[in-house]
């Protein structure tokens, strides 16, 4: 859902707040909580979960391993929830022909580089480039070649876009910026 006028084009970037990431965070949290409860119930010798009688699972070695998996899963789940709440990777791309500027903004992890803000002059943009790799792990990435800076990716490498969509986006952006398109 981009916002576009005659002189300004703003392209929002989703970042880590995707449905699949929410699903993985919930599944991982519930699964690791289950493992931790089973390990704890085997240690206490009580049924904290009514699905498994605590006598069937010995604390050593099954209960210890399940507790370890539960704790590790909770750490990974908390990491996922932090990236979701901080919207790591989210932001926007703003192309302003009136001012002759391109601004790329992304949210990062807390610390020195929490806000990643890049600015370029439109006249320094050499081309819009499409990099396509076919095969089992096919990927298509849209880059912007900046003179003296190299290529800056505009789409995520894990986005599953069709060749038609990436070509259309590249053509619209190249037309808006008045630069050529390169395909690799």
Curated annotation (Swiss-Prot):
Signal peptide per UniProt: none
Stored InterPro entries: PSI_Ycf4_assembly
Purpose: Seems to be required for the assembly of the photosystem I complex.
Bilayer topology term: Multi-pass membrane protein
Pfam families: Ycf4
GO cellular component, one term: photosystem I
Localization, UniProt: Plastid, Chloroplast thylakoid membrane
Species of the source: Panax ginseng
Bridged cysteine pairs (disulfide): none
Record field: transmembrane: 22-42, 57-77
HAMAP family reported in the protein's UniProt record: Ycf4
Similarity remark: Belongs to the Ycf4 family.
Keyword Chloroplast (UniProt): yes
Gene name as annotated: ycf4
One BP term from GO: photosynthesis
This protein's UniProt keywords: Chloroplast, Membrane, Photosynthesis, Plastid, Thylakoid, Transmembrane, Transmembrane helix
Protein name per UniProt: Photosystem I assembly protein Ycf4
Keyword Transmembrane annotated: yes
């Amino acid at each position: 859902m981009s916002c576009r006028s005659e002189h300004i084009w703003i392209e929002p970037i989703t970042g880590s707040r995707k449905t699949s990431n929410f699903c993985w965070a919930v599944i991982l949290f519930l699964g690791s909580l289950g493992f931790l409860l089973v390990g704890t119930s085997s240690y206490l010798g009580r049924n904290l979960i009514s699905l498994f009688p605590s006598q069937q699972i010995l604390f050593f070695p099954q209960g210890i391993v399940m507790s370890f998996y539960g704790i590790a899963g909770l750490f990974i789940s908390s990491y996922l929830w932090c990236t979701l709440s901080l919207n790591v990777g989210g932001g926007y791309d703003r192309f302003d022909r009136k001012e002759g500027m391109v601004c790329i903004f992304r949210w990062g992890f807390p610390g020195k580089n929490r806000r990643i803000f890049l600015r370029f002059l439109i006249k320094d943009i050499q081309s819009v480039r499409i990099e396509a790799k076919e095969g089992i792990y096919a990927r298509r990435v849209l880059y912007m070649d900046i003179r003296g800076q190299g290529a800056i990716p505009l789409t995520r490498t894990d986005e599953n876009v069709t060749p038609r969509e990436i070509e259309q986006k590249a053509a619209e952006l190249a037309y808006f910026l008045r630069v050529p398109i390169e395909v690799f």
